[in-house]
Amino acid sequence: MKRIRSLWFNAEASYSNLNNSPSLRNKNSTGNNSRSKNYRSFSRFDLINSILLLMMLFLLAIFVTALYLTKSSRLTYSHASRAALFNPLGVISPSLGNHTLNYDPEARESSKKLYELLSDFNTAYYDDENMILGSNLFSKNTYSRQPYVANGYIGSRIPNIGFGYALDTLNFYTDAPGALNNGWPLRNHRFAGAFVSDFYCLQPKLNSTNFPELDDVGYSTVISSIPQWTNLQFSLVNDSKWFNPQNVTLDDVTNYSQNLSMKDGIVTTELDWLNSQIHVKSEIWAHRHIHPLGVVSLEISLNTDHLPSDFDSLDVNIWDILDFNTSHRTVLHSTGTDEKNNAVFMIVQPDNVPSSNCAIYSTCTVKYENSTNPINSSESFEEKDVSSNIYNVILTEDQPKIIVHKYVGIMSTEFNKNKEQQDNTNIGLAKMIALNSKGNYEKLLSSHKRAWYDLYNDAFIEIPSDSLLEMTARSSLFHLLANTRDYNVSSDRGLPVGVSGLSSDSYGGMVFWDADIWMEPALLPFFPNVAQNMNNYRNATHSQAKLNAEKYGYPGAIYPWTSGKYANCTSTGPCVDYEYHINVDVAMASFSIYLNGHEGIDDEYLRYTTWPIIKNAAQFFTAYVKYNSSLGLYETYNLTDPDEFANHINNGAFTNAGIKTLLKWATDIGNHLGEVVDPKWSEISKDIYIPRSSSNITLEYSGMNSSVEIKQADVTLMVYPLGYINDESILNNAIKDLYYYSERQSASGPAMTYPVFVAAAAGLLNHGSSSQSYLYKSVLPYLRAPFAQFSEQSDDNFLTNGLTQPAFPFLTANGGFLQSILFGLTGIRYSYEVDPDTKKINRLLRFNPIELPLLPGGIAIRNFKYMNQVLDIIIDDHNGTIVHKSGDVPIHIKIPNRSLIHDQDINFYNGSENERKPNLERRDVDRVGDPMRMDRYGTYYLLKPKQELTVQLFKPGLNARNNIAENKQITNLTAGVPGDVAFSALDGNNYTHWQPLDKIHRAKLLIDLGEYNEKEITKGMILWGQRPAKNISISILPHSEKVENLFANVTEIMQNSGNDQLLNETIGQLLDNAGIPVENVIDFDGIEQEDDESLDDVQALLHWKKEDLAKLIEQIPRLNFLKRKFVKILDNVPVSPSEPYYEASRNQSLIEILPSNRTTFTIDYDKLQVGDKGNTDWRKTRYIVVAVQGVYDDYDDDNKGATIKEIVLND
């Protein structure tokens, strides 16, 4: 059978090569034409028979192989999607190169307006070309406005002045008690501190825990911070004026700028101080290759233009300080000065861990600009817990600038592999690193930048149409890389990565499932060694997990919910009666590394690393589940699923689906390795209970009612990353689940939710573009300016978000967002199939790309690592391509067949469990026959080195027939509920929505139908869900061919006009090309408006789509025709509910998908006239404003506005 399978793959590849047309878009293939031959008759009849017999045998071999493949097992179980007019056959051809994506300058420019939707962006900026994020606002210290530096070993959060230690002093929302605190479990004052990887302490009790009774059986382990190594200060006039984070006030600072370069991880701060007399510039970086080295550069200079007339000189004392008081949860071991080397040092130990310490050794070079002679420290200063060196300098107009370079060596027991050797003590190594670096600033800076550039050579993501999304992808990659490393990670310890990495003690720096399910998979395709280091931490703590199981009388192993220095059961990280799914998460992460198959990951890794984890988890779950004889199924009890709003429930859906899937993995891996396989695993996997409602919606847990509000993605995790779908009925249930739970996520829930919905929507839905609207929903509510760091919550105000102080930065969201692109939009999955004869696992890559209408030009993922090969994955506007660009081994690829997806076959509740309404737009889908050499679940390809596989993208259909607005661009002109994005109103998904922030003010959405729209709106519909508005209005901007021509060219011309003279020269040409004389005044006002609201809409339009055009109008104010008004074509139409209130649904807690209220309308243009009589071209508008007012039931207790689920506009 193995030989037959090999022949089958080669035959498929050969067949694909026959179809080597350069474009799949226009190919009309039936799947059989390429095989039809015209055979000539031969005189020898037996020869003909022989040929026919061989052909029959060949076809039989293909059929048998396909039959076996149909029965084989998978990690990812999605079995198909059928599409109308979709040809799933791909073309294998020689590689064509880089596949440069189309660049649309208008879309790119428009996307930059999305930055303004980010929290706190009003004084922020982003340099797209140089990947620099920054702010011009000098404010009080608050965590979300602070950048950080890190290199995977050391890290430091940087306060407002650019260096030193600072406590937060500002909360945007409230000054209530606790407003400046971090969240669970420390609930301590937030601070800009310094951290070292794996530097954990032990605490007998914490401020907040889940299971305080467990404090009696084991200490909790949380991260310790070390003395702030960026601590430089300087003072003036006999120390009467200090420059440090505590003493610099807002009034002291002008000309402020602080930025973070994502290209090289350097934070630069510049400002003028003391009436602009002194200019201060600092640069801080953690060396990317020499991990124990931190560097601070400080320049202090006189602004000679602002000095008083009697200025003579300025005495400056520069302090190099190590202060134990800037460290948390540590014990001071020793501190002192090294006068010979102008250095200070300090050694601290984490609380209650005397076997560990961290040594910090700091030394400086201080020079006048253009001088080669360093200045020695004039004084050393030591107190009980502070050591410092003081450098006295004098600034004059002849010597106006002093440059300080601070070199800090930082060495912890956990990083020092050679600590057993006497000459390699932590303080000895820290000293050696600092002194060897001293005086080599430029050389070190160059090597640091080179190390970062080399990292980016291994990974790059392009989204040419959207600057914000591309920036978020790049910043997410940066933040994950800054907090992880490949170098000097012991295989017997691994790399523990906390939720907030190396710049914060949010969540106590502990390791959660965030590392296994969110961060590690995002790094695996680009940096498999880093991902393996992270997973090795779980392997290193596996022996403790076995002890945990033994402690509670179970076989196998049980990982605690939280881990740190140890993985014992604690009050923050219980092992039982809580989130058992952590054991599935750890196993899945390890198995994914095997399925990715980078260098050295073979059956030995599977046998000695992955198998013990999965086997022990299987053994534990086999003992943990209980058989319910009434149901004839296995159940689970007293647990918490990922939705932590529901604790101590039974039969958590994700947990039970995870057990089912893990036991399947255990069986397959055991058989593959020839190990003993417990037959009970297959039995439980087959018969574990997944609770469902009578309407076949998966219940998150047994007894769930209809009033549920979900904290975060839970049931949807069964689709991704678990890959639970394994038959058509479960696929159809998963679609219902996606719809149902999309409407029940908490508006202020964590940023780990919607990346999962991206992947689920892309894989499950054959209509609309909600995979992309969910992508925006993953970013806009959660990303914080100015330094593109994710917050855990969409709403950071703990008084309105359920008393949650968000973790920050939230690396979990960075990992989730990257996965939504890498695996969600591309449909890429690591997968496997089992040979039914040999029981051997065969790894393959699943590729299921779809068109991305909200991302014109597509996406590109460069240097994706798979099976130790390097791939490029390209999704353009028409085709999906995998390029085998490096390596010498073929890879197996599977393209799923989308024919089983029926995402509109949803019957609504109709007041009775036995009666349900059909879906809004249910209709039959044209289906094509199965192509040649394609089993029911997909088509297989063998991609060889230097080849590429190109497949036509699946084109999702319109959710509502002839809706000219669906999948178009949209923005909200008024505020929405935190967490909502306007894209949801046009995404073709009836279960996403945009909701105004309040029901008092008029809410507006602005729609762009795109260039040269030839259709006029004659009717339409608004889908409201369960909360309709009180009234609705629609306005359009009258169409003008001249304005359209101007719009089409202005962005490119404005971008390419480098100066005012060139701009003036090109404006005339621009207007001539558009056929617009400058003197021309055209009255498009048409109808008298009641107010200037419609003119405001024009200004909003120009601000959104064409800031360049707004600038052009300022240059040529006589272009009055550009200032025309929107015209109302629907004016304050009252809204009436189209559906009754289904009281029984709530009273009886029925889990049902309820029908949506809807308002239909028609447009009567006879009552409207714009421009010349008889001219109707103005109706073919491009821009539309939809305005809603209030809610139908104004007397309810909810202050939020109506829910707008879908806007349908028909011609």
Curated annotation (Swiss-Prot):
Residues 1-46 are cytoplasmic. It catalyses: alpha,alpha-trehalose + H2O = alpha-D-glucose + beta-D-glucose. Residues 70-131 are annotated as: Required for cell surface targeting. Residues 68-1211 are periplasmic. Pfam families: Glyco_hydro_65C (PF03633), Glyco_hydro_65m (PF03632), Glyco_hydro_65N (PF03636). Substrate binds at residues 513-514, 711-712. The keyword Manganese does not apply. The active site is at residue 644. Its EC number is 3.2.1.28. Keywords: Glycoprotein, Glycosidase, Hydrolase, Membrane, Periplasm, Signal-anchor, Transmembrane, Transmembrane helix, Ubl conjugation, Vacuole. GO terms for molecular function: alpha,alpha-trehalase activity; carbohydrate binding. The chain crosses the membrane at residues 47-67. Glycans are attached at residues 98, 207, 238, 247, 255, 259, 325, 370, 376, 488, 539, 568, 628, 638, 696, 705, 879, 897, 910, 972, 990, 1031, 1049, 1064, 1147, 1157. One of its GO terms (cellular component) is fungal-type vacuole lumen. Periplasmic acid trehalase that catalyzes hydrolysis of the disaccharide trehalose and required for growth on trehalose as carbon source. Growth on trehalose is strictly respiratory. Belongs to the glycosyl hydrolase 65 family. This is Periplasmic acid trehalase ATH1. The gene is ATH1.
